[in-house]
Structure formats: structure tokens, C-alpha cells
Amino acid sequence: QSGFNWSVVQKKWPGFEEAFHGFDLGPNIFMSDDEFDEHLKNTAIVRHAKKILSFRDNAIFLSDLAKEHGSAAAFFANWPVDDLVGPWEVMKKRGSRLGGATGQYSLRFLGKESFILWRDVTAVLISAGVIEKPATSKTALKAVQGALNDWKAESGENMTRISRIVAMSVG
């Protein structure tokens, strides 16, 4: 759903599933130029060239992770929760259009215990002196991870719950 209005994606979801073979990696890895051109004409999906190409690129990325780690799911599931910035960096570097909030939401949708830097979470982190502005640099992201690790240790709660509580504590 990267960069799209979520309600638009939800309405077009059946079209995406059909066009991209139920999200089976194999056919998407080998998307031909002709198939790509057909996707650009397909009114059942959002016709954005770079995002359509990202299906192929991310199918390759996930397939590579599977070869390296047994499965892409194992790669993400086994990544330590005290370093959630790590898989975000991997997704940004090796995936296509998976940086920023997209990577954060991806982990959450995969069921990975994680945090999301919503506007309200960022406001709390700034107010607490953890960061000075929205965290985009590696240094700032590591500071955020450190603060959330501390809150996890102090509270005994998981990262997802902490992230949600922090988000609801302002606004």
C-alpha cells in the first residue's frame, strides 16, 4: 500500500491479487515487459509504473532472503526486536520502495513486534528529548530504538504495544 490512499488500495485489492498472481513470488520475479505494459493499462489496479516494477523487484528481494535464510519470514521473524532499525535498513537498501514508513508498516503487517514512527510517536520522542526532529538519520533512528528498548525493559510490554500507547498519549 506504499504511498497510496489506503481506501483506494482496499477497493482495488482483488485486482492487485489477480494481476500479481496472488502475490506468488515466482511469476512476479519473471514479470515480462509485455506483462508490465498490460499492468499499466489495467484499470483494476493503481497504474503507477515505479510501483508496479517494485512488485518484481520485491519478489526478487524476498526470494533472495528465502535463499539466504530458509524463508523471508524467517529472516524477519528471527531479527532481534532490540534492533528493528536493522531490517528497515535492509528493506530500504535491498528492496524497492520499502524505506521509511513503508518498512515500518511492513514489519507490523507481518506480525513482527515493532514500532511505527507515527507523527504522535515522534512528538513524544521529541518532547522526551530523545530526538530533536523527525528521525530520518541512522543516529536518530538508533536513539529512538534505544529509548524504546529502555521503555520495553522498564514496562515489560512489547514494542507494538509501547508504540501504540505512546501514539495515543498525545493529540
What are these language model-derived features?
Residues Q1-F23:
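A positively charged, amphipathic N-terminal helix/segment that binds anionic biomolecules
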